[in-house]
Swiss-Prot record:
Enzyme type, top EC level: transferase
Molecular function via GO: 1,4-alpha-oligoglucan phosphorylase activity; thymidine phosphorylase activity
GO CC entries: cytosol
Name of the protein this chain belongs to: Putative thymidine phosphorylase 1
InterPro entries in UniProt: Glycosyl_Trfase_fam3, Glycosyl_Trfase_fam3_N_dom, Glycosyl_Trfase_fam3_N_dom_sf, Nuc_phospho_transferase, PYNP-like_C_sf, PYNP_C, Pyrmidine_PPase_CS, Thym_Pase_Put
PROSITE patterns named among the record's database cross-references: THYMID_PHOSPHORYLASE (PS00647)
E.C. number: 2.4.2.4
SUPFAM superfamilies recorded: Nucleoside phosphorylase/phosphoribosyltransferase catalytic domain, Nucleoside phosphorylase/phosphoribosyltransferase N-terminal domain, Pyrimidine nucleoside phosphorylase C-terminal domain
UniProt-listed Gene3D superfamilies: 1.20.970.50, Nucleoside phosphorylase/phosphoribosyltransferase catalytic domain, Pyrimidine nucleoside phosphorylase-like, C-terminal domain
GO BP terms: pyrimidine nucleobase metabolic process; pyrimidine nucleoside metabolic process
Annotated family: Belongs to the thymidine/pyrimidine-nucleoside phosphorylase family. Type 2 subfamily.
Keyword Protein biosynthesis attributed: no
Amino acid sequence: MSDHAMNEQRDHDTRLRAWRTGIDTYQEPIVYMRSDCVVCRSEGFTTQTRVLLTAGTRSAVATLNVVEGNWLAPGVAGLSEAAWHALDPAADAWINVSYAPTLDSLSHVRAKVYGHRLDAGAFNAVIGDVAAGRYSDLYLAAFVTACAGDRLDLSETVALTRAMVAVGHRLDWGRETVVDKHCVGGLPGNRTTLLVVPIVAACGLTMPKTSSRAITSPAGTADTMEVLAPVNLDIAAMRRTVERTGGCIVWGGSVRLSPADDVLIRVERPLDLDSEGQLVASVLSKKAAAGSTHVLIDLPVGPTAKVRSTEAAQSLGRRLVEVGRAIGLQVTLRITDGLQPVGRGVGPALEARDVLAVLRGQADAPDDLRQRALRLAGDILELGGAAPNGSGLQLAAEVLADGRAWAKFQAICEAQGGLREVPVTPYRQVITAAVAGRVAAIDNRVLARAAKLAGAPKAPAAGVDVHARIGDPVQAGQPLFTLHAQTAGELDYAGHFVDTRPPIFQISEEA
């Protein structure tokens, strides 16, 4: 048989009909093939083999799952939703299946697992393959775990950050000063960004804010903003919004400024890992890619916040400043109180309701959210040169009080696609104080967990409404917080969790 004939036969033998299974494997492409499939047998494929799928001009690397029985028809390859969207084949199209290319970068992952330092070239190789979709979730988990804890030193963190910036888009706004902010997180309801951006933009500074969705929390900034306006903007739409209004609040994943970070987050979330080096690289790579020059970092500190002590905040802050300097960012820090939730709502819609109350100047607006946002906005106004040192807070307060911030927020929402109404849930359960006394402490982590079990952020209106704060006197039977759920089952689930845990609100009984 001629070489040409052999190649034609091989092409035929490795082709299968594509079938959309409808299986959601999150963002990991999975292909399903029968155990008696001629392609499996001829190529020597086994479960977990990494294969290259090609349909026309499009290709994707996927993990193989082998199926027994007749769930799949002979000659068919079942594609998960992620694999189907990656290939976008026509119905019943042929796809070619072959071994995926060898990943040389995995040697660097193994080296890190065994405690070796990685240089810039190693991080560039790993992150390049991550961003290209060549890593399975198993490989991603190995890399994330190997870098967790204190396993990344300063030079490695700089190299990882630069590698993450290099594989994404980097925006240029044509301005000498572009400001941004980030909160390290771990504090329920701390949705200051939706107040800070319109205040700062109303003062003439440029603030293109890309925000994340929830990783381990009941709401991310993008989740809360999405209640009020579209956040899945592409780069062109983001640029139009910023040029028209001076600011935006969009989901970073939609503009793919740091695509490697978007991939890593999908395994960090179930592993509940958010180590210092990876946190710094994640935050600053997105800030650099967004074209920012001056960045304010909010570091809430509290026994149940993400950062537990002032010493830990200072250590993390130093790393942020040093890495920022290395990649050309001026980073400023503000260590804030992380003892209790900010505002009343915990969950996308409940937090959005609080934000609107502050912007509209409502009498019942949560004052702690207002004051925290004003301090951060004041810092940014001074950092960006829009206010002299020491006068940023006053300017921010004036802009909020006279309605300029509310007008700017409405303009940003309209530019992003329109201001929406805040949804509410049909199911609620009030949790009351068991004894009279004074609120001594609130467990932020357990409260956030209760909000997640109630359905947040997947159900945007779900979450928790907080009715008491640390230091407040309470009577037995007085409401402490309310669970909000979209379904009766989720409400029961969250309520059972609260009932079987130590009290989220610690009450000191008064003599």
